[in-house]
């Protein structure tokens, strides 16, 4: 069936209805033809019109007789029958885009199929994604074969796609690439045509039409750059002497607004250098730029004017100062924003070259001052939390002879005199302390001598002087606490004795019982028998 343009216009759900020639072997690798049936069913599920062939000669004759009946061909190739499949590929590649499929994954076979003209090589089993996108090869072949070589079946496809893409392309161009408001070519033409309207007179001998053209091109590249007089003298840092220039020359100045303002120059004063052939001499001809077509006055920065400028900069801050704000604070009517901006740039550069070390020293001093409060707080904390030394200081200079190594550990403290007596009262006046494991020594006579402020090195400190360490108070047990401990041990003899108390010996117990009038003491055998009876 021949597809006409009218039929194609009704093809709304493209690529549905795509005609596919499916050439399969008579028997696949499984031997039951299930793979061929699956491939056909998958293509038909995508609304493709599938025509199946099992003989290469029959399929080739159908393509030759009715080329408009097919849009694409899918051919299966096997290692055993490569020659027949390749014959169909060589004959049909100029008419239909041909896709080769195979169950054997062989690089040599794949390369041979692509070399003979196959558009793609797919390995079975075929995925639905691959079969869904085979229409892309149809469109690709329709657009890349040329108008005269496109087959009859692909011409309607190409015309339909061209009509759709043409509309979309126009819309894309209008949206993405709008016509510029000021085309660059138009600007160039205006600059070149300006030579007919502008008459620039130079006071140089070797200035021709080519020099004027180069001058205009250099001026266009500069853009918003400001005019600077080229002189043989050096500019003073504090005083800038400029001349007043007059002119009506029109100059195109590109800014953010994109506006172009033209002026016409009657005469331009050009200062020559030693080498008059340098480009800077010709570029100095176009200098005067003014937005309101008035002559620009270049002021002389006198000391009084510079003083006002410095005061305004210091009030705003060197880093935050801008020309417009400086101009408002100075309140000088003869100055312009351009004059202030130029002078501000020179002022910052001059300050940067002269004051780098002073700024560095200021920052170093400031950081040091910020660090001092932390150091003061640490000293106050160290004074309030003075450590308590449990040992006297040793190893001071002058204690040991020269060359001698002081010992690592301090010498032991030497006690002077006897310790103070410890008066302890027994819990009962009739019971000896030895009977219950509390030995009581004889009373000690004598006085306890308090050691003076003497260190191990022999240094004497006066009374009341601070020696750097504190004497810990001697801790003595309280009599009430001792009485309570002894009473608890007597009332509960089955409990372990507290620390410091020893169990009484058998001799001391018998002696105490005899002293109290208890003479009959049961033997150990009686105690054992009594215990059995209690059980």
Swiss-Prot record:
Keyword terms of this UniProt record: DNA-binding, Nucleus, Transcription, Transcription regulation, Two-component regulatory system
Biased composition (Polar residues): 280-293
Main subcellular location: nucleus
GO cellular component entries: nucleus
UniProt region (Disordered), positions on chain: 206-298
InterPro entries per record: CheY-like_superfamily, GLK1/2-like, Homeodomain-like_sf, Myb_dom, Myb_dom_plants, SANT/Myb, Sig_transdc_resp-reg_receiver
GO biological process annotation, one example: phosphorelay signal transduction system
Domain Response regulatory residue range list: 25-139
One MF annotation (Gene Ontology) recorded for this entry: DNA-binding transcription factor activity
Compartment annotation: Nucleus
Domain of life where this protein originates: Eukaryota
Biased composition annotated in UniProt, kind: Basic and acidic residues: 211-249, 261-279
DNA bind region: 298-348
Subunit structure: Binds the target DNA as a monomer.
NCBIfam families according to UniProt: myb_SHAQKYF (TIGR01557)
Function field: Transcriptional activator that binds specifically to the DNA sequence 5'-[AG]GATT-3'.
Family designation: Belongs to the ARR-like family.
The name this protein goes by in its record: Two-component response regulator-like APRR2
Organism: Arabidopsis thaliana
Lineage: Eukaryota, Viridiplantae, Streptophyta, Embryophyta, Tracheophyta
């Amino acid at each position: 069936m021949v597809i006409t343009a009218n039929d194609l216009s009704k093809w709304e759900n493209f690529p549905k209805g795509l005609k596919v020639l499916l050439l399969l072997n008579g028997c696949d690798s499984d031997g039951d033809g299930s793979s061929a049936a699956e491939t056909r069913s998958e293509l038909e599920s995508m609304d493709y019109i599938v025509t199946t062939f099992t003989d290469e000669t029959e399929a080739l004759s159908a393509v030759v007789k009715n080329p408009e009946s097919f849009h694409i061909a899918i051919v299966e190739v096997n290692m055993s029958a490569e020659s027949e499949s390749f014959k169909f590929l060589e004959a049909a590649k100029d008419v239909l885009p041909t896709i080769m499929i195979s169950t054997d994954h062989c690089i040599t076979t794949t390369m041979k199929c692509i070399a003979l003209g196959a558009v793609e090589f797919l390995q079975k089993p075929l995925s639905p994604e691959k079969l869904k996108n085979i229409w892309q090869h149809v469109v690709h072949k329709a657009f890349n074969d040329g108008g005269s070589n496109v087959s009859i079946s692909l011409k309607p496809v190409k015309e339909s796609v061209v009509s759709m893409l043409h509309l979309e392309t126009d819309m894309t161009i209008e949206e993405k690439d709008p016509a510029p408001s000021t085309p660059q070519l138009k600007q160039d033409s205006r600059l070149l045509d300006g030579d007919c309207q502008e008459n620039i007179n130079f006071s140089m001998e070797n200035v021709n039409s080519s020099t004027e053209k180069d001058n205009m091109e250099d001026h266009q590249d500069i853009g918003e750059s400001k005019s600077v007089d080229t002189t043989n003298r050096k500019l003073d840092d504090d005083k800038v002497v400029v001349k007043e220039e007059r002119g009506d020359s029109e100059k195109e100045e590109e800014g953010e607004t994109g506006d172009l303002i033209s002026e016409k120059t009657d005469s331009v004063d050009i200062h020559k250098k030693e080498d008059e052939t340098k480009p800077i001499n010709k570029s100095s001809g176009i200098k005067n730029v003014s937005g309101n077509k008035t002559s620009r006055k270049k002021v002389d920065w006198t000391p009084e004017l510079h003083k006002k400028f410095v005061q305004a900069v210091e009030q705003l801050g060197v880093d935050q100062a801008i020309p417009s704000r400086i101009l408002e604070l100075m309140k000088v009517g003869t100055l312009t924003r351009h004059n202030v901006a130029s002078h501000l740039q020179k002022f910052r550069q001059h300050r940067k070259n002269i004051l780098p070390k002073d700024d560095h020293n200021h920052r170093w001093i400031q950081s040091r001052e910020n660090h001092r409060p932390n150091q003061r707080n640490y000293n106050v904390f160290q004074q309030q939390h003075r450590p308590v030394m449990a040992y006297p200081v040793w190893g001071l200079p002058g204690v040991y002879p020269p060359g001698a190594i002081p010992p690592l550990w301090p010498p032991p403290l030497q006690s002077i005199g006897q310790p103070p007596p410890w008066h302890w009262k027994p819990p009962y006046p009739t019971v000896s302390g030895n009977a219950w494991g509390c030995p009581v020594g004889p009373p000690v006579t004598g006085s306890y001598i308090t050691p003076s402020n003497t260190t191990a090195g022999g240094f004497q400190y006066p009374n009341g002087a601070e020696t750097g360490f504190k004497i810990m108070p001697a801790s003595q047990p309280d009599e009430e606490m001792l009485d309570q401990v002894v009473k608890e041990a007597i009332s509960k003899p089955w409990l372990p004795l507290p620390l410091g108390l020893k169990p009484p010996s058998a001799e001391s117990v018998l002696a105490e019982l005899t002293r109290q009038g208890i003479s009959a003491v049961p033997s150990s055998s009686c105690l054992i028998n009594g215990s059995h009876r209690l059980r």
